[in-house]
A protein has these predicted regions:
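Helical element adjacent to the flavin cofactor pocket in flavoenzyme catalytic cores
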Residues: 163, 169-207
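Glycine-rich FAD pyrophosphate-binding loop
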Residues: 25-47
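Short, flexible, mixed-charge acidic loops at enzyme active sites
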Residues: 45-51, 160-162
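Beta1/beta-strand and adjacent pyrophosphate-binding region of the FAD-binding site
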Residues: 2-16, 34
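Conserved Rossmann-like nucleotide-cofactor binding loop
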Residues: 16, 41, 204
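Dinucleotide-binding Rossmann-like beta1-alpha1 core, especially the glycine-rich loop
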Residues: 51-154, 158
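Gly/Ala-rich phosphate-binding loop of Rossmann-like dinucleotide-binding domains
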Residues: 21, 25-26, 190
Length: 207
């Protein structure tokens, strides 16, 4: 192996390139990997992300839900492996309405998402029940699917910051956010530990 050759050359050290290097070097044992980028890693579009994730996608078809379920599985594996260095959580996505007619739409949307593979629907119409609020941090032992809440007291108890006339909520659960920069640097460090190299430069041609 010389500085001018490599088994694999990856053009770009954004999150996609770094993830590819990680999976080749760490998971597949391909250690002669070079990343080439004229900028610092994770500095072009990778630092513009909202850093949110979700398995909550409409149809037609279940392709996006299936892709995201698999992607979230991989992210959760990395969070466990790293001690959750990139602060992955599962706070969920929350949709709220003051229009009583939309409550039934929330239930229909939740049922459609469940049919696509997003997880089961739980409807909460009374102050009691088994609604499980999301913690501020972490992702373990959290429900998948969605919760539809139509009881005013339950809404006020768990979401006191919402407007007083809120009549229904849809809480999509396998959603949240994490630090994309911390994830990227963790993957890069692990890949480098296995022999991957990062070169500053521009790829101008492929023979």
């Amino acid at each position: 192996m010389s500085a001018k050759t490599a088994e694999v050359v990856i053009c770009g050290a954004g999150i996609a390139g770094i993830a590819a290097a990680y999976h080749l070097a760490v998971r597949r044992g391909v250690t002669d990997v070079v990343l080439v980028d004229e900028r610092p890693p994770l500095s072009l579009t990778s630092d513009k992300s909202t850093e949110c994730y979700r398995n909550w996608w409409p149809g037609p078809g279940d392709a996006m839900v299936a892709v995201m379920n698999r992607s979230i599985d991989l992210l959760e594996d990395l969070a466990r492996e790293s001690g959750n260095v990139f602060r992955m959580n599962r706070r969920g996505y929350l949709f709220a309405t003051a229009d009583a007619d939309r409550a039934s739409r929330f239930i229909r949307r939740a049922q459609e998402a469940a049919a696509l593979g997003a997880g089961p629907v739980r409807v909460h119409t009374s102050p009691g029940g088994d609604y499980q609020p999301a913690p501020a941090d972490g992702f373990e032992e959290q429900p998948a699917g969605s919760d539809v809440i139509t009881d005013p007291a339950l809404i006020r108890r768990h979401f006191p910051y919402l407007a007083a006339d809120t009549v229904a909520l849809l809480h999509a659960r396998r959603c949240g956010w994490f630090s994309g920069q911390q994830l990227g640097m963790y993957l890069l460090e692990r890949a480098r530990d296995k022999g991957a190299r990062l070169y500053e430069g521009r790829v101008v041609g492929v023979d």
